[in-house]
Amino acid sequence: MTYDRRKFLKTGGLLASSFAISGLACNDDAKTTDGNGTDTAKGDTTAAAVDTRESLTSFGLQLYSLRDDLPKDPKGILKQVSSFGYKQVESYEGDKGIFWGMTHTDFKKYMDELGMTLVSSHCNVEKDFEKKAGQAGEIGMKYLIAPSIGAQKTVDDYKKYADKFNKFGDICKKNGLRFAYHNHGYTFEPLDGQMPQDILMQNTNAETVDFQMDIFWVVTPGADPVAWLKKYPNRFRLCHVKDRMKTAPAKEGDASCDLGTGSIDFPTVLKVAKDNGMEYYIVEQEKYEGSTPIKSVETDAAYMRNLKF
């Protein structure tokens, strides 16, 4: 049976996807590392000599971007991904599981051979979650992520999910990793005078539960990712770097595009993200007008390598 992500989301289910990590560096030759693992410039500090902007030295790919190609040849596609410059991947739970027909240890071994790290995965948290957490912890993954909960009808419904997230967070902690929730647009649309995203963030344990900001899905309903990053410092630890077509109608969800060709100001957003605790920058793309999935993720990698903020 073919895994249908959109159908799964519409039914309000919790499905699966993937992940990535971050490293940041200034762009001059003389650098020193601060306590947060960020490379900073030193030496000649004249404006003409030093470019003080930062760049990402490490970024990842959400494998759902290649959902039509990956199941046919997991190892071959992953090898291509590594050749584009991605250092991390975030998986998702397809018909072959989050390790794509391999055991969790064999998947890690293959990642090591490619010079990549499996940082995280989206998964169906309602099925065999303890087993998944055990396997993820065993191979050093950092996160298991709930990709969706569907739009809820009441504030209390969101509070119930917050309680669930806390339980998932405890299970992850026991296995040496963390739990996160990946947003869609509905948590940034008011419900009974409250914002569902606030409800989830204010009712979860910051010691065990983090959030993955899908920047596209924050912008689509009209919210401001910068404001949310500043409102909840150190809660958004991962993000999906996903651009939005400039010509897309307001609130249109099927509107992602190659990075740098859309309407989202990533230099500004990612700078604020880094300053407020973001660790993992994960590319995701779901639409490929005039291109192919594999070509688009190659183009996206080039954008990420050249991005400065």
Question: Where are these predicted regions, by residue range?
Answer:
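Acidic (Asp/Glu)-rich catalytic clusters
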Residues: 50-54, 78-83, 99-117, 130-140, ...
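Short, low-complexity, disordered segments immediately C-terminal to signal peptides
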Residues: 27-48
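Acidic-and-aromatic substrate-binding clefts and catalytic sites of carbohydrate-active enzymes
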Residues: 66-72, 92-103, 122-131, 151-159, ...
